[in-house]
């Protein structure tokens, strides 16, 4: 599994923990992480995430994380993670202050959450959201 990390906004160097983010995404992808596939983790600012959210999801506001699954381009690769995870650094800073935790942990939480979506988890119902939050927390404690 190839996991690429891109910083498309100014993220201070002490928060650019690429290996940590890759470990979180890999752990969230679980059994898929050892297979073929490629995931891009892209850190963006509030303006960019708002634009993506409006253009692709028809939501006119900024958000914390957005994931997109793409069809796997190789024969026999259907169902393998292949996609983009957009994490908003600005929202991570705001929410870290609001929730009283570190910015890095907030960024990692969003990266793991996005990867869980690529692995097939959903958070459309309260029960699903709770399961996803539990799994996110378990993964963060593990890495």
UniProtKB/Swiss-Prot annotation:
Cofactor field: Zn(2+)
Compartments reported by the entry: Cytoplasm
Superkingdom as given in the UniProt entry: Bacteria
A Pfam cross-reference name: YbeY
EC identifiers of the protein: 3.1.-.-
Stored PROSITE patterns: UPF0054 (PS01306)
Enzyme class: hydrolase
A GO term for molecular function: zinc ion binding
Binding site for Zn(2+): 113, 117, 123
Keyword Hydrolase in annotation: yes
Cofactor remark: Binds 1 zinc ion.
Similarity annotation: Belongs to the endoribonuclease YbeY family.
Name of the featured protein: Endoribonuclease YbeY
Organism expressing this protein natively: Elusimicrobium minutum (strain Pei191)
Gene giving rise to this polypeptide: ybeY
